Regions:
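Histidine-acidic metal/acid-base catalytic patches
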Residues: 2-4, 8-25, 33-58, 65-82, ...
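Active-site acidic/histidine proton-transfer and metal-coordination neighborhood
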Residues: 14-25, 46, 106, 112-207, ...
């Protein structure tokens, strides 16, 4: 599909993809648990590879000139993805096109993604659990309307663990939607042993394996192998962010998949062996090569994942 295709013609024809790869929005990682474990992009999702479902966070498309909801749908299909972690800003822009925020537009937004065979498993609202209760209720309403079972936000500062943890727990419990914490390089293998996740079973981890690798030092009391980290916290992990970073000793660089220190090639057979149904979301953060763009690079990352998963 050409990126020069008009948005109108793309959306009009997107129902053709629905019969091939429509993902049910109900339940956690539905495709991972119901599709054949030997499937490669068939059945529930076009990016379900031998039991591991690959998507991307739509932050990956931030460098594209056009990045509203219609564009995001087109990019996901072109990249061969059947599921997304959708940035909240994309939803907000869609709902405000008439001026005031119109919640009545949410069914049409969901239908547009569903018709293209692209599910939304997470909505990213980095500020959820803050002081704005009205906005938090809106964010929960968005997630439920779009079929997402989780909202992600950043890991708070240690001094805010209790405040943010309790607020997020109350929201997650009230609405039946997970809230998962996304890490940068501030966590170690002990972070989630503390109180942050203890306020509710609905508080989860969005594990960024690349950022974790970039934080690793020689302190064996604070850092363990990233696959051992997943083993330790597998009951609390909802999704994994995929990027290939080098360790701190190697400059903590963001590199193309397969060129850094992050064990992405080992990750897929590891998850397949364990049978853990985590969404694995590409997050494009390395420098885009000259002559390429974010859509082409996400496709490159997806091809890497597909191969690593044995497809």
């Amino acid at each position: 599909m050409s990126l020069n295709m008009t948005r109108r013609s793309f959306i009009a024809g997107s129902t053709a993809f629905g019969g091939l790869a429509l993902v049910s929005a109900a339940g956690m990682c539905t495709g991972c648990t119901t599709a054949s474990p030997s499937g490669c992009g068939k059945g529930k999702s076009r990016s379900l590879y031998n039991g591991v479902e690959v998507g991307c966070i739509t932050y990956s498309y931030r460098s594209m000139r056009q990045k509203n909801a219609e564009d995001i749908v087109q990019y996901a299909v072109e990249d061969g993805l059947g599921t997304l972690e959708l940035k909240g800003e994309v939803v907000d822009e869609y709902l405000k096109r008439g001026g005031a925020r119109d919640m009545g537009r949410l069914p049409a937004l969901r239908k547009m993604f569903d018709d293209a065979g692209v599910s939304i498993h997470i909505v990213k609202y980095g500020g959820i659990g803050g002081r704005n209760e009205k906005e938090d209720e809106y964010r929960m309403a968005v997630a439920k309307a779009l079929g997402a079972k989780c909202i992600t936000r950043e890991v708070p500062k240690a001094a805010e663990y209790e405040t943010i943890g309790r607020r997020c727990a109350a929201l997650a419990d009230k609405h039946g939607v997970y809230i998962a914490f996304h890490n940068h390089t501030q966590i170690d293998a002990l972070t989630y042993d503390g109180p942050l996740l203890g306020y509710s079973p609905n508080l989860r981890i969005n594990f960024d394996i690349g950022h974790y690798v970039a934080a690793i030092t020689d302190d064996a009391t604070r850092f363990i192998d990233p696959l051992a980290f997943i083993e330790k916290y597998h009951e609390k992990i909802y999704s994994i962010h995929l990027k290939d970073r080098t360790t701190k000793a190697h400059g903590a660089k963001n590199l193309q998949f397969g060129k850094g220190d992050t064990p992405l090639e080992k990750l897929f057979p590891f998850l397949q062996k364990k049978g853990w149904p985590f969404y694995c979301d590409i997050e494009l953060e390395y420098a885009i090569p000259k002559g390429s763009n974010a859509v082409k690079e996400v496709a490159r990352c997806n091809a890497f994942c597909r191969k690593a998963a044995g497809c």
